[in-house]
Design a protein with these regions (language model features):
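Conserved small/polar residues in nucleotide/adenosyl-binding loops
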Residues: 1-5, 307-315
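Acidic-glycine-rich active-site phosphate/pyrophosphate-binding loop
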Residues: 11, 98-103, 190-197
């Protein structure tokens, strides 16, 4: 969401009309815009200051949500992401003050969504889980199982929704899974990564590509690049989530098959898994790498450095 076009305008309207509560009706972009307006309402400076970690909010307007697009999980999270058109900067911020007061979630509101939009949302919520799942924190079996159960539920119900867009039960499962995926519950007690999201933010800041479509490209590439640093976890993902059954001695093959099945799942939903599939060439790779490298929010899976050399490799 472009901060220049919507957030400043919303802040001005709220101040002029003495608004006391913001109701966001929509998906992640709508909710995040509402949160940004709530964040800037009582702040005398530029609301972008928060996204550059220059200040902390003292007060925010309360926000409520009527969810129409399950994807971002913003209806239950303290986080938001917006884009500043000047410099094409896409940045996130989080504060408990921004967690919505309530969220009304009726699966029937999602029946009319184009399936591609539904698929992008599914990719986003899977990525939210995987950013937390791929960790080196030990003894997190409970949250591992929560992550795995959510991913399996999303994958199986995505197939049902593809067959029947008005399958209420499948829509409900996906909507609930998207909320849990980014509520903070499954990340408790474990180091999270968020490298793939940071890379994708630079991609969708420059190009007109849906966030979920960018993630379906970036995440498998990232997995192929970093798996050596924690092979056991990638084997676990392949076996428990993607149902790969190969001999225990075939570690590399198991990992690659797990990633391949994830890519095939994305493809089955009509999502891209290569930059070339969405017409993106290499002209901005170095620029995106430099911006992503300066984000400062990478919690690494491993000892792999997200350098200017590493990032273009993942992006390609």
């Amino acid at each position: 969401m472009c901060i220049r076009d919507r957030v400043y305008e919303g802040i001005d309207i709220c101040r002029q009309q003495n608004i006391e509560f913001i109701l966001a009706v929509g998906g992640g972009s709508v909710i995040d815009t509402a949160k940004a307006v709530a964040l800037g309402f009582s702040y005398e400076g530029d609301v972008w200051d928060f996204f550059e970690n220059r200040n902390e909010p003292e007060a925010c307007l309360p926000v409520g949500v009527v969810l129409t697009i399950p994807a971002a999980g913003s209806e239950s999270s303290e986080n938001l992401v917006i884009t500043k058109e000047d410099g094409l900067l896409k940045r996130g911020y989080g504060s408990e003050k921004l967690r919505p007061q309530f969220a009304i979630m009726n699966p029937e509101t999602t029946y009319s969504l184009p399936f591609y939009q539904t698929a992008c949302g599914i990719s986003d919520m899977l990525a939210h889980i995987m950013e937390r799942y791929f960790t080196k924190t030990e003894h997190v079996d409970v949250s591992d199982r929560l992550c795995e159960g959510l991913m399996r539920a999303i994958i199986s119900n995505a197939k049902l929704v593809k067959q029947d867009p008005e399958n209420y039960d499948a829509r409900a499962e996906i909507m609930w899974a998207g909320t849990l995926a980014h509520s903070g519950l499954i990340g408790m007690g474990r180091e999270e990564d968020w490298g793939s999201h940071a890379i994708e933010h630079e991609l969708s800041a420059i190009y007109d590509i849906a966030h979920g479509a960018g993630l379906s490209i970036i995440f498998p590439a990232w997995m192929k690049h970093v798996y050596r640093e924690n092979e056991e976890r990638f084997v676990q993902f392949a076996q428990r989530v993607m149902n790969v059954e190969l001999p225990n001695s075939m570690v590399y093959e198991t990992i690659m098959e797990g990633i391949s099945r994830l890519e095939c799942f994305y493809t089955s939903l009509g999502l891209p898994t290569r930059l070339s599939a969405v017409g993106i060439d290499s002209s901005h790779l170095e620029e995106m790498a430099k911006k992503a490298n300066s984000c400062g929010n990478f919690k690494k899976l491993d000892a792999v450095s997200y350098t200017h050399l590493t990032l273009p490799t993942i992006l390609r």
